[in-house]
Amino acid sequence: MLSLRDVTREHDFEPLRVEGRVPDELAGTLYRNGPGLFSSFGYRYQHWFDGDGLVSAVRFGGGRALGAVRLLETAGLREERRRKKAYFGAYGTAPPGFFNPVRMIRAMRGDTKSPANTNLVSWSGRLLALCEIGKPFELHPEDLRSIGETDLGGVIPRAFSAHPHRVAASGCIHNIGLRFGRPNALDVFVLRPDGTAGSVATIPLDFPTMIHDFALTERALVVLVAPVRLALLPTLLGRRSFSENLRWEPERGTEVMVIPLDAPASPIRFHVDPFWTWHIGNAFDDGGEIVMDMVRYRDFPTTNDWITAMTHGGPFTDSDGLLGRARVDTKKKKLSFEAVRDKTGEFPRVAPSVDARENRVVYWTEHYDASVGRSGPPDTLVRVDMRTGARDEHRCPPGQFPSEAVLAPRSDREDDGWLVSLVYDSSTDESHFAVFDAARLADGPLARAYLGQHVPLSFHGAWVPASR
C-alpha cells in the first residue's frame, strides 16, 4: 500500500495549514503511534506491524493547530544503525542471514528489538510508547524527543502489552504482559494515579501464545486466550518470522480468564468455542455478568492473512471482524456474542468518562461495503449505539483512509466533544488530522490540519487535554 513506506521528514511542533475552523474550546494534544520505517539498510520489512515506531502529534489551542513527527530512537534501531545492517526479526519479518547463536541467546533472555510502534499511554505526566513484545519506551510529551526504555522501576520483567485499560472511577491503569518459556505466564500490572507502578500477579499459561488485548471492568480483568500457539523453538532459532510460527489449534477452544482486581492470583478460568479478537473497546459489570464491546473474528489465520495482504497491496481475503457485545457469565462459564454491526472494521474506542463503566456509544472505523474490505483499510468513521444499533457515520472521499478515531471530550457525555482522526489521502500522498463534532459525524469534518507530508497508517493514540 502506498502509505506503508518510510517517512521522509521528522520535525518538532510547527504550524499546520488548516482548512475549516478549529473549535476554540478544543485544547490539547493527540499523540499517534505507528510504523515509520519499513526497511533497515535495504532489508525490507514484510509486515505492517514491523515498522520502527513513529509518533505523530497535533496540538490544538486558540483555534490553531501545530504538528510534529518523530521516530522513536529505540535500542534496537540504534544497534542496527551502529552495525550498518539489519539484525533483528519482527512479527512478520524473519531475521536476516543464517542461524545466529548470539541472537538466539539474546532472544531467550527477552533481549530483542521492540519497535515501540503500537500505542501510547499518558500516565502521571509521562508519555510511554508501547509494543507488546517489549517494555515501555518513554518520550518527552513536549517535543517527542526519545528518552528510552523503562521497566518502571523494576516492575516489568519482560513485556508490557500495548493495550492498557483504565478504570475511570479510580484513575488506575491496568495492563498485562507475556513471558515465554519456563514459565509461560501472564504478568498483571497496575499504574496508579500517584505515579507508582506495581506487579500484582503472575498467572501460568498452558502454552506460549499471543494475547493482543484484554478487557477491564471496575472489578476484574478479562483475558481471552485464543488457541494460537507459538512454536517457540523455530522462533528462537530465527528460521521464520514470529507470525509464521503461530499455529491455530481450534480444538483447544478459547480460554476465558476472569482476574478479580481484589484477588488477582485467583482467576476464574474456562473454555468456550474458538474465536479471535484484536481489540476490545470497553467492558463493564452488569449484575453477575461482564459485558465486553469487541471486534470478533471467526479465527486467527483469516485476519492475519488479511493484514499481511494489506502490507503488500493484496490479494485480499474477505475481512470478517464484526463489532458486537459479548457477555461473560462466570457462574455458568459461558460467553455469548451478538454482532451490532454487519459491516467489518476495527479500532473500537469509547469516551474516557466511561472507561470500565457502562457505555452506550462506541466509535470505530468501518469498511463502507464488502468491496472496500477486499481492497484495503476502512474508509468510514462510525459512532454506534450499542443498545439499538443506530449509527452516525462519515465516509471519507475515495482514496482517503482514517485512523482510529479518538475522542477529545468536552464533558462526560459520551458524544460531547470532538473526534480526531489522522487521515491518509492517497490522491495527494499527504496526511491530515480531521476534526469532527462527535455528535454529528455525518456533517463531515469541522477542520482539517495538514501535515504537508505522508505519515504511514498508524495504530493507536492518546488524547492529552491542555493543562488548565
Q: Which role does the model predict for each range below?
A:
Residues 1-468:
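Beta-propeller domains
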